[in-house]
UniProtKB/Swiss-Prot annotation:
The keyword Iron applies. Residues 457-480 are annotated as: Disordered. It catalyses: 5-N(alpha)-glycyl-dTMP in DNA + AH2 + S-adenosyl-L-methionine = 5-C(alpha)-glycyl-dTMP in DNA + 5'-deoxyadenosine + L-methionine + A + H(+). It comes from the Viruses. The keyword Iron applies. GO terms for molecular function: iron-sulfur cluster binding; isomerase activity; metal ion binding. Isomerizes 5-N-alpha-glycinylthymidine (Nalpha-GlyT) into 5-Calpha-glycinylthymidine (Calpha-GlyT) as a step in the pathway leading to thymidine hypermodifications in the viral genome. As a final result of the pathway of hypermodification, 5-aminoethyl-2'-deoxyuridine (5-NedU) substitutes for about 30% of thymidines in the viral DNA. These modifications probably prevent degradation of viral genome by the host restriction-modification antiviral defense system. It comes from Pseudomonas phage M6. This is Radical SAM Nalpha-GlyT isomerase. GO terms for biological process: symbiont-mediated evasion of host restriction-modification system; symbiont-mediated suppression of host innate immune response. Iron-sulfur cluster binds at C125, C129, C132. Keywords: Host-virus interaction, Inhibition of host innate immune response by virus, Iron, Iron-sulfur, Isomerase, Metal-binding, Restriction-modification system evasion by virus, Viral immunoevasion. InterPro entries: MJ0683-like, rSAM.
Amino acid sequence: MDHAAWLNEETGEAAQEAYKYFMRPDPNQREFLGPIEEEDDPLTGMRAKFRMAKVGMVRNAKDEDKKEVKVYLGFNDVTYLPHIRIPNAKPLQGWYQDKHNDKRGSRARPCFSEAILTEPYGGYCTVGCAFCYVNSGFRGYRGTGLISVPVNYGEQVRNMLSKSRTSAAGYFSSFTDPFLPIEDVYHNTQQGAEAFVELGLPIFFLSRLSYPSWAIDLLKRNPYSYAQKSLNTGNDRDWHKLSPGAISLQDHIDEIAELRRQGIYTSIQVNPVVPGIVTHDDIRHLFERLAAVGNNHVIVKFVEAGYSWAPAMIERLHKRFGPERTKAFTDLFTENQAGAQKTIAEPYRVEAHQLYRKWATELGMTYATCYEYRRGKPGTGEPAWLSMGREMITADQCHGQRVPMFTRTDLDQPFQEVKECAPTGCLHCADDNEGKPRCGSELFGAAKALRSPDFKKIVEPTPPEEDGGERKIIPITQID
């Protein structure tokens, strides 16, 4: 996949327009874009091409609200994606919501096991998916068409992990693709992942681009590490329209075959399924191609969009697939769900999941859902909305294989597996153990939305009471 060649095409995609805006040699509006300049860059040791630009931090910002930034365009006569540098990386964190989340307009966490969310690159993603929530954001650099690059990301991750006594697998990344071409310059994903692996922690990557050899090498260093790709149709032509900046579908299948040949667990996010554009037959064909190369696990999620940007997504689908197929989609895209999300009608989703789970099982793959909710049944005590996750899953955890938590007493020691971790992860650990987390921790056993201060605490079993009674569960104290 020649990423730069795609960005130079004239198909009117937003990613292409943003790229050409910053790359044009002689802009008409000098007050917004300065001339292209060159300098020796001490960070990379290369000759950098850049220009100053005024950008807004919200879409359609007023001129007086724009700020001047330095936009890097290339190095050593090689053109890269327009990007800026930022000094501070986003703090490492867990999932966004608690298991018991009753906030109005929100929804409870469906994720079985913990993960540490990373962001080696932020802002805009040039893979250009029709359904992308990242590029549809209204605030920050994602609204400018610029990628944001945290400087010395690997060192910043090392520093954050150096203060942590508890961790989970490092997730690279739920935001922009971790293997964007500028990774060849900055190595943020590689160095961030190395920081986890060197401490004995597992990692996983999620990408629509090609896995570099170093990523495969890192995955092989921990038995709990695994590879993910995001593939949402078995139709090669439609795949290119859905994710025009991605590598070809066949290239993905070939890479999955190689990952499995090297003994790496593969967990494919069939995400998001866009009915009307993607048919049941397309999903069946994708499953067959995945199973043929030994894939382990599939995670299926139907498309959803925030109320504010759903119209923009529909417009992109109309442009790429035409009115007839887009209407077939919008006829099903009718459910207003918890979390201020619009999604596919529940009866269609439930029936499809049951069918897809059957197919996956027949083909030798385990199955799970992701952020799929149904309405609670009146009179049963169920909440207004609840996750379908446990009803549909055939694996240990929603990402497939069991991946435990890790902890350590001393900060100068590698992390060690929490042996008490249940196959289901933290989400259902206490549910299956008479309401008691197996590790004894009220914090980690409650499947909360963990943040940096939480990871400074240690996980350890609470010793039994001296009188031989049941183990007492107490909050774990922070060690400074």
